[in-house]
Amino acid sequence: MGKEKTHVNVVVIGHVDSGKSTTTGHLIYKCGGIDKRTIEKFEKEAAELGKGSFKYAWVLDKLKAERERVITIDIALWKFETPKYYVTVIDAPGHRDFIKNMITGTSQADCAILIIAGGTGEFEAGISKDGQTREHALLAFTLGVRQLIVAINKMDSVNWSEDRYNEIVKETSNFIKKVGFNPKAVPFVPISGWNGDNMIEATTNASWYKGWHKETKEGKATGKTLLEAIDAVDPPTRPSDKPLRLPLQDVYKIGGIGTVPVGRVETGVIKPGMVVTFAPAGVTTEVKSVEMHHEQLPEGLPGDNVGFNVKNVSVKEIRRGNVAGDSKNDPPKGCDSFTAQVIIFNHPGQISAGYSPVLDCHTAHIACRFDELIEKIDRRSGKKVEDSPKFVKAGDAAIVRMIPSKPMCVETFTEYPPLGRFAVRDMRQTVAVGVIKSVEKSDKGAGKVTKAAQKAAKK
């Protein structure tokens, strides 16, 4: 096996008919974690149903059904390998809560793959009328995704026309530049997801195609296929050197063991013997043990979903949405208010001070009041366009001071990204997204410090 490969997370975006499912399905099918038995089973069913040509998208539909049926997602279904990386597709697009998932999502995407339909008329529809592609690209950029790959799909439907390809590259470059990406750093790859052309092996249908190239701070890279473009992603840095932040997903009471909070380590490291503080609950105690998949761990690192056993704390004292951190190293605190850059997506009316929607930030789900609209800004450059606007509407971006209706723990986006981005939910949809610029933390003295914590401190 040799050295473990680095893990990278990609998110696939694009218009609803761009062929995202087919393309994603193809990569997973050819390079992925689906075992051969499952594939044979699907192929047999496909043949019986007269879907004999076996469309990759159909595999993906089957996987989606499995994924929705099985509560513990078999994430192998959403992984594939490149020579350098293990790649996880964070969200199968087309998902209703795509936007919310990208924000509160299990992980920060390291790279976005934008799939563009190259068919006559399709490209134009995807980019112009339907704002969805733009919205998703803007969202990825706002949430700190700086690496992008553009796959120009359905090239078979335009006979691999060089003119058509160049036209789309030009238009798409303008489009992504408006969003904030640098086109020089973006590989453009012509593909046919349906036929699997130029996805894994270089196409033989386009003698004119000399390959893609990109230039980033890390240097230059070139290649032919989509797989090579994914393999050329700059390796992500994982924040294990930062102080611990672990938002709780659940808290269990387990007979014979006691209280076991569960969650994903976002930054830092959690170890047995560490004294942790839960915010905003204000409870401090010692970590007895850390485990993942029913195995004891010497430490939990960023990205690990862990359960940890804590002493002298009842299930009633801590809950989902609380954040655990190291009591000796920038411990987390609750906040009285925070200031954020908010982009309004799809709200039918005008939003003014006093608006109180629900915020989803990491695992917390709490109503917050838009207390003051400080300024309206240009959503690309971040420059101020208006002081103290009376209201904001869909398409606007603003700096807003927000007050949570009950104690919550958030951080600035620059220091702790997963705790500094949020979705604004109202009318059963995501109406806005935000990144937190500053936090007014509440200094409500130390809360409960357990005997175990005091003992551990003396060691």
From Swiss-Prot:
Gene Ontology cellular component annotations, sorted alphabetically: cytoplasm
Sites bearing N6-methyllysine, chain numbering: K3, K30, K316, K390
Domain of life: Eukaryota
Region G2, residue ranges: 70-74
Keywords: Cytoplasm, Elongation factor, GTP-binding, Methylation, Nucleotide-binding, Protein biosynthesis
A single MF term (Gene Ontology): translation elongation factor activity
Region of interest: G5: 192-194
Pfam families linked: GTP-eEF1A_C, GTP_EFTU, GTP_EFTU_D2
Location(s) in or outside the cell: Cytoplasm
Residues modified to N6,N6-dimethyllysine: K3, K316
Residue ranges, annotated region (G3): 91-94
Record keyword Protein biosynthesis present: yes
Residues that bind GTP: 14-21, 91-95, 153-156
Family annotation (Gene3D superfamilies): P-loop containing nucleotide triphosphate hydrolases, Translation factors
Ranges for domain tr-type G: 5-240
Region (G4): 153-156
Residues bearing PTM N6,N6,N6-trimethyllysine: K79
Function: This protein promotes the GTP-dependent binding of aminoacyl-tRNA to the A-site of ribosomes during protein biosynthesis.
HAMAP family reported in the protein's UniProt record: EF_Tu_A
Family per record: Belongs to the TRAFAC class translation factor GTPase superfamily. Classic translation factor GTPase family. EF-Tu/EF-1A subfamily.
Protein name: Elongation factor 1-alpha
Encoding gene per record: TEF
